[in-house]
Amino acid sequence: MIQQESRLKVADNSGAREVLVIKVLGGSGRRYANIGDVVVATVKDATPGGVVKKGQVVKAVVVRTKRGVRRSDGSYIRFDENACVIIRDDKSPRGTRIFGPVARELRDKDFMKIISLAPEVI
């Protein structure tokens, strides 16, 4: 479960490698984030020369979780890691490439640009 102080791998080429969650957006006192939820995070590890620098505060959408999510047909989808994609305020990604699979639940939450850039949608 992703909450405050959780560390997420960054699944794009924005320059960040790892982020730490500061806040889960959506409602007062909301504790946990799942796939498709937006979080405010700070960059803990970054590649040199990237768009995003270490220490920067960014918004990110969760694209993979170890806990997984239940689908309407009763099946569960879960991944090997917790990962996110750094986004702008208009829900478009800051990077130009997405690495690894993303969940189909992002389509329901209008992250169509991330869906189109992803190599695999599960």
Curated annotation (Swiss-Prot):
The keyword ATP-binding does not apply. It comes from the Bacteria. CDD domains: Ribosomal_uL14. This is Large ribosomal subunit protein uL14. Keywords: Ribonucleoprotein, Ribosomal protein, RNA-binding, rRNA-binding. Binds to 23S rRNA. Forms part of two intersubunit bridges in the 70S ribosome. SMART domains: Ribosomal_L14. The keyword Ribosomal protein applies. GO terms for biological process: translation.
